[in-house]
Amino acid sequence: MKVLLELLLGYSVHILAHELPDLPRTQHPPKSELSYWCTYVPQCDFCWDCQDGICKNKITESHFIDSNHSIVNCRVFRDSKTQSCLYEISSKMPNHFSMECLHPRPYTGNEIFMQTWGGGVTINNYL
């Protein structure tokens, strides 16, 4: 199952890099691309649906965290000319994270601060 998931993800990366146009800077990436953007920076606010301090992952719909302060504001954009996928991450120490769309890698910034809710699975297990 894990191998199949990795193959599908690799295929989607290939499609993203070669067939999709530039993505202007946005805080709301297209729904069809959420799984891509949320895989590499899973703490982005657009990856979570938060109500009353409980946040549910939009991709898996089964991972919960209980601290809204763990969620960071993100803007993403894609430059097809340079084959770059970029994140602007706003937290206590705002930064930029860029990667080659064809060779993505996870951001390892503040996910260690995310807290699970009700014995749920941590964010690290969802990657």
Swiss-Prot record:
Pfam families: v110 (PF01639)
Disulfide topology: none
Region forming the signal peptide: 1-17
Entry keywords, A to Z: Signal
Domain of life: Viruses
Purpose of the protein: Plays a role in virus cell tropism, and may be required for efficient virus replication in macrophages.
Similarity field: Belongs to the asfivirus MGF 110 family.
Listed name of the protein: Protein MGF 110-14L
Species whose genome carries this gene: African swine fever virus (isolate Tick/Malawi/Lil 20-1/1983)
